[in-house]
UniProtKB/Swiss-Prot annotation:
A single GO cellular-component term on record: large ribosomal subunit
Name of the molecule in the record: Large ribosomal subunit protein bL32
Sequence segments annotated as region (Disordered): 1-37
Record bears the keyword DNA repair: no
Keywords, sorted A to Z: Ribonucleoprotein, Ribosomal protein
Similarity-based family: Belongs to the bacterial ribosomal protein bL32 family.
Biased composition (Basic residues): 7-16
A GO molecular-function annotation: structural constituent of ribosome
One Pfam family per UniProt: Ribosomal_L32p
SUPFAM superfamilies (UniProt xref): Zn-binding ribosomal proteins
Any one biological process term the GO annotation gives: translation
Length: 56
């Protein structure tokens, strides 16, 4: 089993963890339907930037 040679300080540990924070997803509201969706993604009913791009 691997064992560290020297103890890592709180500062080094926290600097490593500084990139682990999660960000909230950018959500938009569709112009035509008012439905919320992820930015740069098609809505569930097939609209993207006010245009119907997928026919169901």
């Amino acid at each position: 089993m691997a064992v560290q040679q020297n103890k890592k300080s709180r500062s080094r540990r926290d600097m490593r963890r500084s990139h682990d924070a999660l960000t909230t997803a950018a959500v938009s509201v569709d112009k035509t339907t008012g439905e919320t969706h992820l930015r740069h993604h098609v809505t569930a009913d097939g609209y993207y930037r006010g245009r119907k791009v997928i026919n169901k």
